[in-house]
From Swiss-Prot:
Family: Belongs to the RCAN family.
GO cellular component, one term: cytosol
Chain's role: Inhibits calcineurin-dependent transcriptional responses by binding to the catalytic domain of calcineurin.
Name under which the protein is recorded: Uncharacterized protein C13G6.15c
Length: 163
């Protein structure tokens, strides 16, 4: 197989150029890549086409690059199928199917959401005991205490900063 490459704008001209060189078994045009893949039935015709395309340009003057690539990149000559590793035979045919219908009389129940409680019960009780208690231990470092005032003149909660 030969791969002809030019700019994507000149792919149609490249395809016509490839068709005129020698009889082609089939071609594939890759517009976005600016490539034409051409396959030939005869190796001698393929080699002749490679020599003819060495001029390096289309009739419009656009550069053309031609490369020879193997038709089957996985084929290695000299190794038969008997010498290569074979896929093992299937012992069982595994069938993955959806689950069956629910049993007769089954009714769906409404379940509680998974995170209905944010904290464990014992931790929540201890926090409720603390309430708005102010810890007066100033030796532990700086503290920030936020509390609400019942004063109607102040609309935002006051903040106490202690050092």
């Amino acid at each position: 197989m030969l791969v002809f490459t030019t700019s994507p704008d000149h792919v149609d001209e490249l395809n016509e150029f490839v068709q005129q060189l020698n009889p082609v078994a089939f071609t594939r045009v890759l517009r976005g890549l600016g490539k034409v893949l051409a396959s030939y039935n005869d190796k001698a015709v393929e080699e002749d086409t490679l020599k003819k395309s060495s001029t390096g340009s289309l009739p419009s003057g656009q550069q053309v690059h031609c490369q020879y690539v193997l038709d089957d990149p996985n084929h290695v000559e000299g190794i038969s199928v008997d010498q290569s590793l074979q896929v093992p035979k299937f012992e069982k045919n595994w069938l993955i199917s959806p689950p069956g219908s629910p049993p007769v009389g089954w009714e769906p129940i409404v379940e509680e959401s998974p995170n209905s409680q944010h904290l464990a019960h014992d931790i929540q009780l201890k926090l409720d005991e603390l309430g708005n208690a102010l810890l007066n231990d100033h030796s532990a470092g700086p503290q920030i205490v936020i509390s609400e005032h019942n004063n109607t003149k102040e609309t935002s909660p006051s903040r106490q900063f202690e050092h």
